[in-house]
UniProtKB/Swiss-Prot annotation:
GO terms for biological process: NAD biosynthetic process. Its EC number is 2.7.7.1, 2.7.7.18. PANTHER family: BIFUNCTIONAL NMN ADENYLYLTRANSFERASE_NUDIX HYDROLASE (PTHR21342:SF0), PHOSPHOPANTETHEINE ADENYLYLTRANSFERASE (PTHR21342). The gene is nadM. Disruption phenotype: Essential, cannot be deleted. Deletion of the gene could be accomplished only with complementation by another NaMNAT or NMNAT encoding gene. It comes from Acinetobacter baylyi (strain ATCC 33305 / BD413 / ADP1). NCBIfam families: cyt_tran_rel (TIGR00125), PRK13793.1 (NF010365). Dual substrate specificity enzyme that catalyzes the formation of NAD(+) from nicotinamide mononucleotide (NMN) and the formation of deamido-NAD(+) (NaAD) from nicotinate mononucleotide (NaMN). Shows nearly identical catalytic efficiency for both physiological substrates. Plays an essential role in all three routes of NAD biogenesis, de novo synthesis as well as the deamidating and nondeamidating salvage pathways. Pathway: Cofactor biosynthesis; NAD(+) biosynthesis; NAD(+) from nicotinamide D-ribonucleotide: step 1/1; Cofactor biosynthesis; NAD(+) biosynthesis; deamido-NAD(+) from nicotinate D-ribonucleotide: step 1/1. The keyword Nucleotidyltransferase applies. Belongs to the archaeal NMN adenylyltransferase family. The lineage of its organism: Bacteria, Pseudomonadati, Pseudomonadota, Gammaproteobacteria, Moraxellales. This is Nicotinamide/nicotinic acid mononucleotide adenylyltransferase.
């Protein structure tokens, strides 16, 4: 018997690393279904957000069995620089998936000041996780990636395969050039 009908996990997953994997594994143990809210889901690429929402979905699902994949749902959250509008967007997208009278929770880790959004959903039961994988940050992982390295100790196998394939793309080369120039603008 699960504690929740749905657990929501919000993140950018740029890229999907072991702490993300561990969080979803815990969510799958505690909830019948897991809703992954992919942040920064607008169809733009830049050095902070190199992967589109559809690519992140594939990267994430590549790390789970078919049985677990069937229990994972995605919603795409567009960046809105207004907390109230952003919260409304998240709730609206989640509510489109859940069944009425469902017990919904929010799973996450307060890693730093950027995690304040976890407190914006008081109607959802908070499942606060202690530090996972030493509070991994994707920023140095992306930087290494743009330098041509994949920190294999940070990523599950499905992510490693995705990153290796993506490295062969023209888009990766364009992002790598933007990184070297410290150009944070979107790819055109």
């Amino acid at each position: 018997m699960y504690k929740f009908d749905y657990l929501v996990f919000i993140g950018r997953f740029q890229p999907f690393h072991f702490a993300h994997l561990q969080t979803i594994q815990i969510a799958l143990q505690q909830s019948r279904e897991v809703i992954i809210a992919l942040g920064s889901a607008q169809p733009e690429r830049n050095i902070k957000n190199p992967f589109l929402a559809e690519e992140r979905q594939k990267m994430i699902l590549a790390n789970f069995s078919a049985e677990d994949q069937a229990r994972i749902h995605f919603v795409n959250i567009i960046d809105v620089y207004n907390d109230q509008k952003w919260v409304e967007q998240v709730k609206q997208l989640v509510n489109a998936i859940i069944e009425s009278r469902s017990h919904v929770g929010l799973i996450g880790h307060f890693k730093d000041e950027s995690s304040y959004y976890l407190k914006l959903f008081p109607e959802w039961t908070m499942v606060e996780l202690e530090s996972l994988k030493e509070s991994m940050s994707a920023t140095p992982m992306r930087e290494a990636y743009y330098e041509g390295k994949i920190i294999e100790s940070a990523f599950p196998e499905g992510t490693i395969q995705f990153l290796k394939t993506f490295q062969d793309s023209e888009i990766y080369k364009q992002l790598q050039q933007k990184y070297r120039a410290q150009d944070s603008s979107n790819l055109i």
